[in-house]
């Protein structure tokens, strides 16, 4: 089984990921936890390029191709081998993020984005995508609080520094994907304390057919 977590900045998906893994392991899954960008050694180098604030002049096209390169390596060297071994892969962001960030928010040609995604993924799609949804204002408030706790400088946060309209387009893009693929997406209200959000996530997962592994 292949499960991905998606959401705008500050949606809380990374916070919920360990809770998700605990739930899956209690239901018989052997989990491999990964992320994009940066799920492989090569991918970690690409991640550094993508998130480096010194690269604030990176063109949208460059950004798109770097994400595609990261994903192509990730799918072929980690995701597909783990799935072939019968493991459950849990990934913090995947191809949907590229469609909404580079397509919806950056305004790149959507057909180009989708073609690159198909090549990079080799046609692999998640079985379940958990979309943690909340208004951008609330998500960015959380994100900046996390950044302050971690001692990062505001100038070091390339995506958080985008205008509010950018984050609104990201949210709209995710919700559009969820409307188009309701059989794959599970939309979770991400407002409120982490424990409450976790409860909503678990309740939603318990309704998913075949979530139990023999």
Swiss-Prot record:
Reactions this protein catalyses:
dTMP + ATP = dTDP + ADP
Q: Which InterPro entries match?
A: P-loop_NTPase (IPR027417), Thymidylate_kin-like_dom (IPR039430), Thymidylate_kinase (IPR018094)
Q: Where does ATP bind?
A: 7-14
An annotated GO cellular component of this protein is: cytosol
- Which keywords fit this entry according to its UniProt record? ATP-binding, Kinase, Nucleotide biosynthesis, Nucleotide-binding, Transferase
Might you give the EC number(s) for this enzyme?
2.7.4.9
The UniProt GO MF terms for this protein read: ATP binding; dTMP kinase activity
Q: Biological process GO terms, please?
A: dTDP biosynthetic process; dTTP biosynthetic process; dUDP biosynthetic process
* UniProt KW Lipoprotein keyword: no
Q: Which domain of life is it from?
A: Bacteria
What Pfam families does this protein map onto? Thymidylate_kin
* Coiled-coil blocks: none
Tell me which family the UniProt entry assigns to this protein: Belongs to the thymidylate kinase family.
Q: What does this protein do?
A: Phosphorylation of dTMP to form dTDP in both de novo and salvage pathways of dTTP synthesis.
Protein name per UniProt? Thymidylate kinase
Classification from the root reads: Bacteria, Pseudomonadati, Thermodesulfobacteriota, Desulfobacteria, Desulfobacterales
Q: List the gene name.
A: tmk
